[in-house]
A protein has these predicted regions:
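A structural boundary/capping signal
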Residues: 1-222
Length: 222
């Protein structure tokens, strides 16, 4: 086990720029024929939008990996732990009242417990830079940030979504993995839960462990 501490900066102007562009991306992706196609287009657009804005945080991970002589697996675990340490914050694309009225039992129970949420976000997902700026993220906001950082670190990664589970996790293409995986163009991507601490590569909640209930949206292989 190793401890990590890092400091990075974000700006309100860059954050607001991402918010403004996000509306256009969401409207464009909404023409998709299916929810999987929508999220694939939307996630890809959000990544491209923020690709240049996350260089500072990527450099922190890259420098740390070099200094500590980490392999790809260890570097991925470092990124995963960083995201897991950020407290959970439900993000949804409507008001809290509408989210409760149309949401599943998790959403209803979450609001009934007066837990924190971030309403009126297009598609119910924040972009990588937006999340780094305000630290408000649920499942797919976290998965997209993990994908964005790992992609820039040249580590194979993917964002998984499940209509059956109403959930999203990160996939990472590593050597000698264990646990749940999906093969993406010949490379095994191991799933990992990012909304709670302690999950390692290949580990998800028991109720979410059927790989056939997961679809791959954006991905990259190196």
């Amino acid at each position: 086990n190793q401890n990590y501490q890092a400091k990075y900066n974000t700006s309100v102007r860059s954050y607001q720029g991402s918010q403004k562009e996000q509306t256009t991306l969401s409207n464009s992706a909404s023409q998709s024929a299916s929810s999987i196609e929508y999220f694939t287009k939307y996630y890809a657009g959000l990544y491209k939008m923020d690709e240049g804005k996350i260089n500072e945080i990527v450099k922190i991970f890259k420098d740390s990996a070099v200094k500590k002589q980490m392999n790809a697996n260890e570097t991925a675990e470092m990124v995963i732990t960083f995201i897991q340490e950020i407290p959970y914050y439900l993000v949804h694309d409507e008001s809290c009242v509408k989210a409760v009225a149309s949401g599943n039992s998790f959403v209803k129970q979450y609001h009934a417990s007066n837990k924190p949420c971030f309403p009126n976000v297009k598609g119910g997902v924040q972009s990588p830079y937006e999340f780094l700026h305000n630290l408000k993220g649920d499942c797919d906001t976290r998965s997209l940030l993990g994908f964005a950082i790992l992609k820039k670190l040249k580590i194979a990664s993917s964002v998984w979504v499940s209509e059956a589970y109403g959930h999203s996790i990160l996939g990472v293409g590593v050597q000698n993995g264990h646990g749940i995986y999906k093969t993406v163009n010949g490379i095994k991507h191991y799933g990992v839960e990012l909304t709670a601490k302690g999950y390692r590569l290949g580990m998800v909640a028991p109720e979410n462990n059927n790989p056939y209930n997961w679809d791959i949206t954006v991905y990259n292989n190196y």
